[in-house]
């Protein structure tokens, strides 16, 4: 009895509306295409248990950050997040938030929120993640299934691997 599931890599849907919104906010994302939700849903019964959709998250977060600075132009000169804005403007072809968030990497890595400007920016990052993932959790029929996932600590998982389980 071996239990396993397959992972669908590179399976982002790349929502066109988000790409269009990024470009309307000054981005320059070209030739961005994804896999349709219907195709991904058709793969689930074939043993797919994890669908990697990181590109969708990156797009939604980048769009939200661009929108934040468009709606709050005074934040462009913020001591703590102004450099994030400058990177967004300098790297118009990028959509990976890691390219823009380097000035506040302590926040990204450790959750350190030094001021209200960083807190406000992180709020729109969180909303982008929830928008991208929330939609797909519902579409893939996974809503309400989190309690079914067995919780295991890193140490417990390491022990399982040592035992070959």
Q: Model-found features: residue ranges?
A:
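C-terminal alpha-helical cap/extension of soluble enzyme domains
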Residues: 39-165
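Catalytic alpha/beta core domains of metabolic enzymes, predominantly
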Residues: 1-60
């Amino acid at each position: 009895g071996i239990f396993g599931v397959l992972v669908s890599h590179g399976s982002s849907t790349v929502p066109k509306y988000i790409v269009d919104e990024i470009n309307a906010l000054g981005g320059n994302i070209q030739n961005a295409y994804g896999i349709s939700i219907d195709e991904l849903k058709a793969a689930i019964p074939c043993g797919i248990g994890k669908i990697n959709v990181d590109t969708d998250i990156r797009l939604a977060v980048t769009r939200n950050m661009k929108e934040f600075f468009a709606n709050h132009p005074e934040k462009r000169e913020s001591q703590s997040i102004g450099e994030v804005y400058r990177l967004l403007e300098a790297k118009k072809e990028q959509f990976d938030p890691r390219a823009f968030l380097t000035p506040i990497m302590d926040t990204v890595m450790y959750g350190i929120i030094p001021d209200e400007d960083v807190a406000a920016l992180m709020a729109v990052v969180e909303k982008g993640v929830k928008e991208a993932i929330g939609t797909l959790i519902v579409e893939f029929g996974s809503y309400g299934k989190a309690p079914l996932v067995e919780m295991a600590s890193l140490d417990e998982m390491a022990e399982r691997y040592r035992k070959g389980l």
